[in-house]
Amino acid sequence: MSILLLGKDGQVGWQLQRSLAPHGEVIACGRSECDLTDLDRLRSLVRQLKPAVIVNASAYTAVDRAESEPELAMRINGEAPGVLAEEVARLGALLIHYSTDYVYDGCKTEPYLESDPTNPQSVYGRTKLAGEDAIRASGAKSVIFRTSWVFGARGGNFVKTILRLAREKEALNVVTDQIGSPTSAAMIAISSSSYTNEPP
């Protein structure tokens, strides 16, 4: 079985290369091999490779910068997943996609459920929700993971930053108005790879 992995160089993508390998031939692409802003090239790549599974770990993740680059964020987070989903539906394949807790408004005091209403408050959140909506509208077989506070051995993340600051400073000043669920990139990758055995 062939598995197309997009976003191979990120925290989750790096782990996915390892967890997906036992499940088939992994064709791993980074930004240089697959630019998600070029939707025609993206479509051509999928048509050429005809994978049984596409794992989209690629995204525009600069939450604050998305406010000044809304078109670019929408292209990568909203439109590219839609193109992938259309091609997956055409192939009868499976799409595994990663979204975010930013699709919610952050007002709830308990953990969010998948069934809770979405209400993104940022450009980033709106673009990620647009990607989810495009996937669902395509009718493609898909799994969407809403992740938050991802950490891993590779790349920068909140956990690494706090550990570094704890070594460097006597006292830390950290915001107290944010709630999240730190999620291991390795756990995300292992959970994702299990879907290649039994598609939904």
What role is predicted for each listed range?
Residues 21-44:
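Adenosine-cofactor binding site in Rossmann-like domains, unifying the SAM/SAH pocket
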Residues 15, 19, 87, 134:
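Rossmann-fold NAD(P)-dependent oxidoreductase module
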Residues 68, 75, 80-83, 90, ...:
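Catalytic helix-loop patch of NAD(P)-dependent Rossmann-fold dehydrogenases
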